[in-house]
Amino acid sequence: MKKYLKTDEWNIIEDQFHPDRQRMSESIFSLGNGRFGQRGYFEEPYSSDSYRGSFVAGITFLDKTRVGWWKNGFPPYYTRIPKAADWSRINLRLIDEELDLAGWDVDSFNRRLDMKEGISYRDMEVTSPRGNQLRIHVEHITNMARPNLCLIKYSVSSINYTGRISLVPILDGNIVDDADLPNLKIWNILRSGSTSSCAYLWTQTRREDTQVCYAMTYQFFKNNKETTANPIRIEKEKQTGFSVGADVKPGDNVTLIKYTAIASSLYHERSELVEHSVAEAREAKSIGWNTLVEEHRRAWQEIWDETDVVIEGDPEAQQGIRYNIFQLYQTYRGDDPRLNIGPKGFTGEKYGGNTYWNTELCCVPFFLLSTPKEIAKNLLAYRYNQLPKAIENARKLGFKDGAALFPQVTNNGEECHSEWEITFEEIHRNNIIVYAIVQHAALTGNMDYIAKYGLEVMIAVSRFWRQRVSFSQPKQKYVILGVTGPDEYENNVDNNWYTNYSCIQCLKMTLRFLEMVAQQYPDEYAHIRRITNLDQVKESARWRDIIEHMYLPEDKERGIFIQNDGYMDKVLESTDNIPAEERPINQHWSWDRILRSCYIKQSDVLLGLYLYYFYFDTETVRRNFEFYEPMTVHESSLSPHIHSILAARIGKVEKAYQLFLHATRLDLDDYNNEADQGLHITSMPGSWLAIVRGFAGMQVLKETLCFSPVIPQKWDSYSFKVNYLKNTLHIRVRKEIEISLTAGSKVDIQVYGHPYTLERGTELKINMPMC
């Protein structure tokens, strides 16, 4: 772990300069608004170790697949989200000197990310090689209210310097990709230009013809008075901007406000990009900094009013949970079904910005429960819109009759992952998509989506499973061979329990909702039968046969489910036996050694017990938890929160708390020694779920919202809001549980198994057992 950031409930603070941790800090201080985002690199050039990266949502680049041994079914290309132009660049120049913290003395330094208001601040005092001392203050905003705008206020005060200070706002298209192909040239500059106060840079990806135009204007102040400053236009290869400045003496200050508008061909006609971005930049300047910042603050306040979690007595936990919520909303706005959430969001290029099954596991339930807005529905629509591609993906692997295999990794619906043990074998990903569809229905009460869209997906996935299973004559059971389960430290195994069990549940849900739609939505049912060529009697019989005869490996003596065939033949030992200097093992051990070990990357059997909790009693969960958790290294960000939830449910509250901190502060404390590459965005909602579904014990049982709260010893209280069936409940847990209905009319709930009816304006108070 790396603990160098200050603990504060609403702020992330780095109170001294850490050049050895610059890349990690750039990840931590990332900014975004769902349409674009940037790592938290310095606005001015920095010649030491740095990972500068800016990204625009929905912009992808197709890169040819490169593998040592080509296998039929491999995708021909890999999609990635490329670095975009650097729109935040501001150079600071003195006479014959230019600010570069790699070569200047940093006398004081404070960087602060205000999560409540969504503003990044940087304050520092620096001394140049020639002894010139300056005080610098920077405010940086990616506007949540106007999602095409970025705002930067860059202020410089002279401490002992007499002479000219020039500030140089630039749009920089001279970008080098930081992924595995640093020499890959992704962007063409179509045109750049400037007037006396506005510059633009019009760009296009080389292979997809996707276009982005950046436009920038500015205001310049000396001693808080605006001046025109006689700008010098800058036009270089792939760069455009201005140099503005003033003569200063000690005590004087200059300030530049940079207004940047970003427009992409995802939202605008190509022929209008320049005009639109220039107009929006100019409009921003006319509106002014103060008004734009206030709009931005209000937008964040609306988000926090819905989603904030308050933890009293534990500032580290409070900081962590707010940070995770903050970064998730910086990454995804939820207003465009063409977009999804990449594992790194706008904080890095790893994973190519692609969509994984993390979205359905963590993000969909978070948005379903935390906001009345239909954000989750757009994530489901993203998958529905890609159903034809999923059917095509399955066809490439030999499946037919409308069977669908959703990709492990995608930006456009086509598979673009080229590790065979993942692409071909981690097929459990299909089931979490069906699970998310059903969760949407269960938590919103809206069955229309299933009738119009969801059932079509469920049928296609169920057809895949009917063809993917094999019937074992010796076992007289259906088996699923050659798979990788959620634990990616086990490859090409047979009968992964989670895969087999989630297959059963997928088929059950399809059968259930087929009957529901047939009865309640006859027109939609007729449409689905027609477009899918469904033979319900014949196909349902096959699905039921698989459900009834699926092989599920178990150890009856231990009372546990076996992760997969052969797992129990391994040397079973605790992670305590791994030397600290060899963690994480994926950064120190050979792949052969990992595969032969018993160590589990992430929740596997336990993931099934979490998702399908209503089928398992507490003792079953306890036995499996106590067997598998000691062998789990949690080297996937998807793991700690699942274990935390289960630990809370079986009464291991302090263990749940330790795992919660792991999930909540995974990036802030760099548990896995990889925060420098970017944040773990799609697992961040897991920390929220660990509170709501773990400590608060929220479950839906027999269409009733149920709570069984516990509280970690360190906490005085915790509180949150949750949405269920168009109702919003506020829950506070301390020595007594307080539940009120803040939106809606009436809802039936259970607390510790006892039924209650909540009405608007009333509050339920219940003493916590044993307190």
What are these regions (language model features)?
Residues M1-Y351, W589-R593:
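Acidic/polar, glycine-enriched structural segments that form the non-catalytic walls/loops
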Residues R23-V56, T60, N358, C362, ...:
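C-terminal capping/lid segments that line or modulate ligand- or cofactor-binding pockets
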Residues I311-Q318, D335-D336, L369-L380, A441-E456, ...:
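Structural helix-adjacent loops and short alpha-helical linkers that scaffold large soluble proteins
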Residues Y332-T347, K373-Y435, A441, D448-K452, ...:
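Helix-terminus loop motifs that line ligand-binding clefts
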Residues T347-T355, A404-K452, A460-D545:
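The feature captures the catalytic groove of carbohydrate-active enzymes
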